[in-house]
Amino acid sequence: MPRISDRVTYIYVEHSKINRVDGSITVAESRGIVRIPASMIGILLLGPGTDISHRAMELLGDSGTSVAWVGEQGVRNYAHGRSLSHTSRFLELQAKLVSNTRSRLQVARKMYQMRFPEEDVSSLTMQQLRAKEGARIRKIYRKMSAEYGVDWNGRTYDPDDFEGGDPVNQALSAANVALYGLAYSAIAAMGLATGLGFVHTGHDLSFVYDIADLYKADITVPVAFEIASEYEEGDNVGKISRQKVRDKFIGGKLFATIVRDIQLLFGIKEEEQLNVEPLSLWDNREGNIKYGINYSNENED
């Protein structure tokens, strides 16, 4: 089982049947069957029309893969599975930090400090930090609009009418949802609570929004304006956005970055950081061998 940070970020599946063969899941759809090693997946997003077998879920649970049932285009999250981490120490630390006003403010300031690396925000109030962040985001939108030649009339988003937005807002929505899924995967895999946010509060995904906001300006916003600048009538903006942002995730190793940044935000020492060891079978001749494979002789009864 690879470390959390070494896994593929996410795989989105819809209108398919998912089963299990040895240590892999199989995804069957109209174009054929694809075999994917379960332990290499960070989070499996199950969209509409997806059937998954009990055996496949058993494998995904054993391998620590996060599973989320989502709506079309991934714009809604209905449910999720277990975490990769089987320890509660990070969850206990998160609860401790968020329950104390002073430590919560310290973590929130660290989050804003990541956005303003050349400035000292250690003495700013939450109100001042929010105002500073709002100005930064507006500036980024204006910059991207000018750079890509895309009209920008503000952020508009209706989760019940994805197609109703203009191309850049559609792309932002789809790209952000993919980013939320990735952040959600890392948070859940570490055994943390998605609802215990430091900046956001009152929602079951508050901490997901906290973490995702750290990376939007560098990833989803530029991707969205790039897609909008190349938009042609009939383009599936949601699909294109997911594909482009996925490439950004993989190329920039964002999953590993999120895992690292969360632990830095919480002040976890390097020697205490999460490291999931591989699960193997012991063999007195061959040493450790792969887990999850049937080693019986096919000719045996």
Curated annotation (Swiss-Prot):
Binding-site list for Mn(2+): E133, H200, D213
Q: Which InterPro entries match?
A: Cas1, Cas1_I-E, CRISPR-assoc_Cas1, CRISPR-assoc_Cas1_C, CRISPR-assoc_Cas1_ECOLI, CRISPR-assoc_Cas1_N
Q: Its GO biological process terms?
A: defense response to virus; maintenance of CRISPR repeat elements
Which top EC class applies here? hydrolase
Cystines in this chain: none
Q: Which cofactor does it need?
A: Mg(2+); Mn(2+)
Which Pfam families does this UniProt record tie to the protein? Answer: Cas_Cas1 (PF01867)
Task: State the UniProt keywords alphabetically.
Answer: Antiviral defense, DNA-binding, Endonuclease, Hydrolase, Magnesium, Manganese, Metal-binding, Nuclease
As recorded in UniProt, coiled-coil segments are none
Extract the Gene3D superfamilies matched here.
CRISPR-associated endonuclease Cas1, C-terminal domain, CRISPR-associated endonuclease Cas1, N-terminal domain
Cite the GO molecular-function annotations of the record. Answer: DNA binding; DNA endonuclease activity; metal ion binding
**Top-rank taxon, per record:** Bacteria
Q: What is its EC number?
A: 3.1.-.-
Q: Which family does it belong to?
A: Belongs to the CRISPR-associated endonuclease Cas1 family.
Summarize subunit and interaction data from the UniProt record for this chain: Homodimer, forms a heterotetramer with a Cas2 homodimer.
Main role?
Answer: CRISPR (clustered regularly interspaced short palindromic repeat), is an adaptive immune system that provides protection against mobile genetic elements (viruses, transposable elements and conjugative plasmids). CRISPR clusters contain spacers, sequences complementary to antecedent mobile elements, and target invading nucleic acids. CRISPR clusters are transcribed and processed into CRISPR RNA (crRNA). Acts as a dsDNA endonuclease. Involved in the integration of spacer DNA into the CRISPR cassette.
Q: What is this protein called?
A: CRISPR-associated endonuclease Cas1
Tell me what organism the protein belongs to: Clostridium sp. (strain SY8519)
The protein's gene is named cas1
